[in-house]
């Protein structure tokens, strides 16, 4: 056991106790907690341009706020964010904008989200109860370091990240910077130090250097990643390049630009020489927990991860966006982060509901107001309420609301496709490691193709059964009946498909850490990208 890591972890958890206790109390006081947050935003930002325009100073209730401030999307903030990027202030928040954090967008190639100290604090208010609850349920995690994934740079250096030398900085230097101040500094001491690897453009070099640092930490206790395939691809590289990686640990790696050297560790390399790369428990015997996305389409990827790490508990993350921290793992559920932001939810009748008005079993679209200056901002995330913790709704992510494929009027939504695949794949393709439904327009009449990677040959009935499920969408069935679409096809792809999928999105400007697992892509051309032929569904 690393005494240093243990001491720092205990200090870090001690610092989280206040946030944990406040969150526990708030679970039974949803309405006053949320109303206090909203009134605080209005009072603090009444003198801003946005606050004056919408009369923040005279708003006295949630209803008045909803009447005066319309629902918003990122497009409503573009002009303000461009001014913030140039160094202006007092536009959306009274608090100074410390940086603009890049994230992917549905209509924009990339969005820049304003981060203030208030917003950092709001993220911290969700992280504190999550981490403290985790320590209570698995105290062994406090005995050693953790790895929280970072991702390679989204753009070439000097292109957009951090390029505003006369205005507001773009991007944080590390994931722990989300917390800000001394908490971020303390959190950083508990982690395997990989922050400098974010400057690497080449994905293979990024994985190599990440693995060398992880392999050097024999006492690793926890791994936190976003996309489950981020970790499975690391594990694939671990097996494929085992000999070279052990040599790298023994000799060390030289620095490269902003990336520091990895020190030589021949003693650890001798330990690794006796380990089995296909059994991570022989490499990290005290690794007990992996945290990753586990709702929506990501749920279909968890079984493969669990097979690779049979001794490790996989904890699904809450719903976390760059803009807001929506829910967190706590007490075996995923309650709303009610101490972090003011939440609203749009129901199927287009009515705005507050957090204390939600009903179990119902589905909603998430709307947030945050300390970063986003007001009634539509995240376009669909959730369902699966229970309550105290009086606070526990939610589960269903899919992106604005991910709809519509070549001929069929209007297939990602949320619905994810539900279909979650029913079919465990029965007809139980060892699936990758699955993506996407439209193809080359070769005549367009069709949808299910690209699937599986350790076993999918059942012959998969294509026909999937076609029957898709035909339950009357628009899709109508397009097929009219000959506008061919029936769905099933194409088996190799194990590298997940990596090719991530690389295509990354080349399009997406950051690996921001890519959520998705059941449906609206992009065409995956057939060529995967380099394969596709047969009709009923021949699959």
Predicted regions, residues:
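Contiguous, well-ordered alpha-helical segments that form the cores/surfaces of helical PPI scaffolds
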Residues: 98-102, 323-326
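Active-site diphosphate/adenylate-binding microenvironment
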Residues: 32, 36-100, 112, 118, ...
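Conserved adenylation A10 loop of the ANL superfamily
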Residues: 100-114, 234, 490
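Glycine-rich, histidine-containing beta strand-loop boundary motifs that form or position
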Residues: 101, 114-119, 150-152, 224-227, ...
């Amino acid at each position: 056991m690393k005494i240093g890591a243990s001491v720092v972890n205990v200090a870090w958890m001690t610092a989280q106790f206040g946030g944990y206790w406040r969150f526990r109390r708030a679970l039974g006081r949803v309405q006053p907690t949320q109303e206090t947050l909203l009134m605080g935003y209005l009072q603090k930002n009444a003198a801003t341009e946005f606050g004056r325009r919408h009369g923040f100073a005279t708003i006295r209730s949630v209803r008045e706020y909803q009447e005066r401030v319309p629902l918003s999307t990122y497009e409503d903030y573009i002009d303000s964010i461009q001014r913030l990027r140039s160094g202006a202030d007092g536009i959306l928040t009274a608090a100074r904008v410390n940086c603009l954090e890049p994230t992917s967008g549905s209509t924009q190639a990339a969005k820049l989200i304003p981060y203030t100290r208030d917003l950092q604090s709001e993220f911290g208010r969700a992280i504190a109860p999550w981490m403290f609850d985790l320590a209570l349920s698995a105290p062994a995690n406090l005995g050693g370091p953790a790895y929280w994934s970072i991702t390679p740079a989204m753009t070439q250096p000097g292109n957009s990240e951090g390029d505003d030398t006369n205005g507001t900085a773009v991007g944080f230097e590390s994931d722990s910077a989300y917390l800000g101040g001394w908490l971020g500094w303390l959190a950083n001491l508990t982690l395997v130090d990989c922050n400098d690897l974010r400057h690497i453009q080449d994905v293979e070099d990024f994985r190599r250097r990440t693995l060398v640092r992880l392999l050097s930490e024999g006492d690793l206790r926890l791994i936190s990643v976003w996309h489950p395939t981020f970790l499975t691809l690391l594990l694939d590289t671990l097996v494929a390049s085992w000999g070279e990686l052990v040599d790298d640990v023994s000799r060390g790696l030289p620095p490269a630009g902003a990336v520091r050297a990895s020190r030589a560790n021949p003693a650890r390399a001798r330990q690794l020489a006796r380990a089995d790369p296909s059994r991570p428990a022989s490499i990290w015997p005290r690794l007990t927990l992996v945290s990753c996305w586990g709702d929506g389409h990501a749920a279909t990827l968890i079984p493969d991860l669990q097979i690779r790490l049979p001794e490790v508990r996989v904890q699904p993350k809450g719903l976390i966006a760059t803009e807001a921290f929506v829910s967190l793992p706590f007490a075996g559920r995923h309650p709303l982060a009610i101490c972090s932001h003011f939440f609203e939810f749009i129901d199927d009748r287009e009515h705005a509901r507050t957090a204390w008005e939600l009903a179990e079993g119902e589905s909603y679209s998430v709307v947030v107001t945050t300390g970063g200056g986003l007001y009634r901002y539509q995240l376009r995330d669909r959730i369902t309420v699966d229970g309550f913790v105290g009086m606070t709704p526990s939610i589960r992510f269903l899919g992106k609301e604005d991910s709809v494929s519509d070549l001929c009027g069929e209007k297939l939504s990602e949320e619905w496709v994810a539900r279909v695949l979650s029913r079919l794949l465990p029965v007809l393709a139980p060892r699936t490691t990758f699955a993506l439904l996407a439209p193809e327009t080359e070769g005549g009449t367009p069709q949808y193709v299910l690209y699937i990677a599986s350790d076993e040959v999918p059942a012959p009935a998969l294509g026909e059964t999937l076609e029957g499920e898709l035909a339950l969408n009357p628009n899709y069935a109508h397009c097929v009946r009219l000959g506008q679409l061919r029936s769905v096809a099933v194409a088996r792809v190799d194990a590298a498909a997940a990596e090719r999928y991530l690389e295509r999105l990354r080349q399009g400007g997406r950051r690996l850490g921001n890519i959520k697992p998705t059941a449906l892509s609206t992009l065409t051309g995956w057939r060529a990208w995967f380099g394969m032929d596709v047969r009709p569904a009923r021949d699959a």
